[in-house]
Amino acid sequence: MSWFLIAVATIAAVVSYKLIQRLRYKFPPGPSPKPIVGNLYDIKPVRFRCYYEWAQSYGPIISVWIGSILNVVVSSAELAKEVLKEHDQKLADRHRNRSTEAFSRNGQDLIWADYGPHYVKVRKVCTLELFTPKRLESLRPIREDEVTAMVESVFRDCNLPENRAKGLQLRKYLGAVAFNNITRLAFGKRFMNAEGVVDEQGLEFKAIVSNGLKLGASLSIAEHIPWLRWMFPADEKAFAEHGARRDRLTRAIMEEHTLARQKSSGAKQHFVDALLTLKDQYDLSEDTIIGLLWDMITAGMDTTAITAEWAMAEMIKNPRVQQKVQEEFDRVVGLDRILTEADFSRLPYLQCVVKESFRLHPPTPLMLPHRSNADVKIGGYDIPKGSNVHVNVWAVARDPAVWKNPFEFRPERFLEEDVDMKGHDFRLLPFGAGRRVCPGAQLGINLVTSMMSHLLHHFVWTPPQGTKPEEIDMSENPGLVTYMRTPVQAVATPRLPSDLYKRVPYDM
């Protein structure tokens, strides 16, 4: 009975505190929260669409209570600018739940670190050492190796009789490029052979990534109401097991590289070698090195494949745009060689298509939460210290106040007006902005552009037999990142000489 009374008293105290807080502050409008759980069970599976719908009713800034935590969601470019520029310093911390706390070793990485000396240090490592133009250029042959390997696989499979009518599932090929590219950049290892078979270490890597996404996407009551966690001990065990599994694999790879560096007395350009070389100079702990490596993997693997799949779906759905891109290829690159990243600057319409794809289909449509480290006002409303603020990037990109015909896929809009997408224009924010803008934005843009351009230069893409372009399912799957609900299927017809469909291997 005493435990029951304590529980009742605790609940009453929490409810009373929240009521007093709501009388004291002027919060943004939003759906009415329920006691204890807030709006947790009002949120629909595709979260960013749910918040967009609520914004249509309540306005471009809304309150969403997840448990006892206030989450403020903004859905306009003007308010995004307030969050990411005008009040950037007060909103530069991160909210970490149990999964991200475990993943980041209490914020010892970059993505989940609070703003402070540690964040400034590891951000400096990323911008001055890891994602420099020089290093990205030195790693370019890896990217070109992987996209040409993809072209070779598509060419082989599209000529099989059983695929000529039903087409190919593009996700398989794009996922292989993203997987091989990020593991080679981060770890210097290609876990997948030429036949697409993944080795034992690679299977473990993929399992860790998949399990981490499942844990990270949790909306369970225990994840958001800390004082109920004792009721879910299995969750704590799952987080601990996942962290140990990830660290075991990463330490083994780090040890391999340490031994290789000792034998060769030199470091390669892979990120693991760079971080091990910089360890003493920047005073990087093992937890920070592991955290940074996995930040790059989680931020750079699925997101690139997802964006490229959406872009290709738009090409199949909009044959006019596909044809216009291919006409530009034929003028600039021709039909007697394969294109390279050096060609991108001479392909303005291709760049517009990439921008339009990022606008309509940002890989992380709901920006990772910024936590307030002080009381702040956004849009005239009070945001108390400790609140979470989200920018609904997907909604901002569909705001008719700043985009003409926002739901239309029309790359020409970027020929009419040059819009930056690396954090300087708050209408287009696929990589965030301000202090927490993604340091690897250019790498992501290069890889998506490379995957897309090679597929379009080498092949004409049409829907499977019996499917009309307008029948392609353009709905999203629930999750932190936006996979297409139905993987896009398409028929590939080669358009270049057959000797241009071979992989250009690079051993590094």
Curated annotation (Swiss-Prot):
Question: Which keywords does the record carry?
Answer: Heme, Iron, Membrane, Metal-binding, Monooxygenase, Oxidoreductase, Transmembrane, Transmembrane helix
Q: Where in the cell is it found?
A: Membrane
EC numbers, comma separated:
1.14.-.-
Q: Which cofactor does it need?
A: heme
Q: Where are the transmembrane segments?
A: 1-21
How does this protein lie in the membrane? Single-pass membrane protein
Pfam families documented for this protein: p450 (PF00067)
Q: Name one GO biological process term.
A: flavonoid biosynthetic process
Per the record's keyword annotation, is Metal-binding included, yes or no? yes
Expression (tissue specificity): Highly expressed in stems, roots and siliques. Detected in leaves flowers and seedlings. Highest expression detected in differentiating xylem.
InterPro entries attached to this UniProt entry: Cyt_P450, Cyt_P450_CS, Cyt_P450_E_grp-I, Cyt_P450_sf
- Entry's Gene Ontology molecular function annotations: heme binding; identical protein binding; iron ion binding; monooxygenase activity; oxidoreductase activity, acting on paired donors, with incorporation or reduction of molecular oxygen; p-coumarate 3-hydroxylase activity
Record's keyword annotation contains DNA repair = no
Where on the tree of life does the source sit, at the highest rank? Eukaryota
Q: What happens when the gene is disrupted?
A: Dwarf. 91% and 97% reduction of the levels of scopoletin and scopolin respectively, but increased levels of skimmin, the beta-glucoside of umbelliferone. Altered lignin composition and increased susceptiblity to fungal colonization.
Matches recorded under PROSITE patterns: CYTOCHROME_P450
Q: Where does heme bind?
A: 438
One Gene Ontology cellular component: membrane
Induction behaviour: Up-regulated by wounding.
The Swiss-Prot or TrEMBL record describes its family as follows: Belongs to the cytochrome P450 family.
Function in brief: Cytochrome P450 which catalyzes 3'-hydroxylation of p-coumaric esters of shikimic/quinic acids to form lignin monomers. Can use p-coumarate, p-coumaraldehyde, p-coumaroyl methyl ester, 5-O-(4-coumaroyl) D-quinate and 5-O-(4-coumaroyl) shikimate as substrates, but not p-coumaryl alcohol, p-coumaroyl CoA, 1-O-p-coumaroyl-beta-D-glucose, p-hydroxy-cinnamyl alcohol, cinnamate, caffeate or ferulate. Has a weak activity on tri(p-coumaroyl)spermidine, but none on triferuloylspermidine. Hydroxylates preferentially the 5-O-isomer, but can also convert the 4-O- and 3-O-isomers with a lower efficiency.
Query: What is the protein name given in its UniProt record?
Result: Cytochrome P450 98A3
Q: Which organism is it from?
A: Arabidopsis thaliana (Mouse-ear cress)
Taxon lineage: Eukaryota, Viridiplantae, Streptophyta, Embryophyta, Tracheophyta
